[in-house]
Regions:
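Active-site-proximal beta-strand/loop segments in catalytic clefts of secreted hydrolases
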Residues: 29-33, 52, 116-119, 150, ...
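Acidic/polar loop patches that form or flank catalytic/metal-binding clefts of enzymes
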Residues: 28-31, 57-58, 82, 92-98, ...
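Glycine-rich, small-residue loops and helix-cap segments
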Residues: 25, 82, 207-315
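A short helix-breaking turn/cap at a secondary-structure junction
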Residues: 47-134, 303-315
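Short glycine/serine-rich loop segments
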Residues: 1-85, 261-269, 274-279
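Hydrophobic/aromatic ligand-binding patch that stacks against planar heteroaromatic rings
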Residues: 17-19, 137, 254-258
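Acidic-enriched catalytic cores of C-N bond-cleaving enzymes acting on peptides and small amides
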Residues: 76-99, 112, 121-152, 159, ...
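Short helix-loop capping/hinge segments that flank enzyme active sites or metal/cofactor-binding pockets
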Residues: 110, 163-230, 267-277
Length: 315
């Protein structure tokens, strides 16, 4: 249940987000494939960080898609994000996407953020009303916010993840399953079919993956490479065009899930229920810079809320 009221909780890492938001723990772990960290961060008003894919090992994690899975961390304290993240990183020879973080310190060199706005969802009105104080405080602190329309883009996520899960789950079950448990994806789905009341969430997704025609490994590899490049090029083009390092959103976008770069949700207003958050993203490997930015913006958000409360009292 969402601690803020009768609202949706988000994706499959919602349990971690709820535990953090409710104060049951200081930090929790989750895994993002396509929104499973970011969406619960939005819905439950917590800091949810998806590192660059490959910086944190996926070994032992129940897989959905080895092409896109990325472990991350959720907290109520932005400073704790960095502490937990640095304790998780390390090269894992068993993870074919694993690589080493080059630098342990990085501060943003430019105070410019590109904010992608989906006007059809009323996001511009939200910026002009409930987030007006936050934007004003950003400017007072030297930040330049450039508003652009959210580009429309789609990826072959369903095809890739549905192909991945059949092989990935089978491999996982062979390694970690016991003798009395299914040893293949097909066996797992059949087991779930026998107990439909116990598996209400995600069953349709598993059935779709089972029914989807399989593609060759070489074709899958090419498709993954094309989609990752498409996402990274989109991000790079926007940041390069506006000479910026960070791009923000008022709702989840899957560019960083697909491209692999870091992203993080940042609660900016608790005056409404559920809280209002933004999502920030950066280029691959720019993890510590985005964590530094999130920490700085969290202080600005607190100042904006304080100013807004004073204004409400004066009225």
């Amino acid at each position: 249940q969402n601690p803020h009221g009768n609202f949706p909780c988000g994706g499959s890492s919602a349990g971690s987000a709820i535990a953090v938001a409710a104060g049951f723990c200081d930090a929790a772990l989750g895994t993002e494939t396509r929104g499973s960290l970011m969406i619960p961060g939005f819905r439950n008003g917590v800091y949810s960080f998806k590192p660059t894919r490959g910086l944190v090992s996926r070994t032992g994690i129940i897989p959905l898609s080895s092409s896109f899975d990325a472990p991350g961390v959720l907290t109520r304290n932005p400073a704790l994000l960095k502490e937990v993240f640095l304790s998780m990183i390390g090269v894992d020879p068993a993870d074919d996407q694993s690589f080493e973080l080059r630098s342990k310190e990085s501060k943003p060199s430019r105070k410019r953020i590109i904010l992608c706005v989906n006007r059809s969802l009323g996001e511009m009105e939200l910026l002009q009303t409930k987030l007006r104080s936050f934007l004003a405080q950003l400017k007072l602190n030297g930040f330049e916010i450039i508003f652009i329309d959210l580009p429309e883009v789609s990826f072959d996520y369903t095809t890739i993840s549905s192909t991945d899960i059949r092989a990935d789950i089978t491999k996982f079950l062979h390694r970690y399953g016991s003798d009395n448990e299914p040893r293949s994806f097909e066996g797992l789905v059949e087991c779930y079919r026998e107990r439909p009341h116990a598996h209400l969430y995600g069953m349709e997704r598993l059935e779709d993956a089972l029914a989807m025609p399989q593609i060759e490994k070489s074709e899958l590899k090419k498709l993954v490479q094309e989609n990752v490049a498409k996402a990274r090029n989109l991000i790079d083009d926007i940041l390069a065009h506006y000479d910026a390092d960070f791009v923000g959103f008022l709702n989840f976008v899957d560019w960083f899930s697909i491209g692999g770069g870091p992203s993080c949700t940042l609660p900016v207003s608790f005056e409404t229920k559920p809280p209002i958050s933004i999502m920030l993203g950066a280029r691959v490997g720019n993890d510590l810079a985005i964590l530094h930015l999130v920490k700085e913006l969290s202080e600005i958000a607190k100042a904006a809320q304080h100013v807004e409360k004073l204004g409400n009292k004066a009225e």
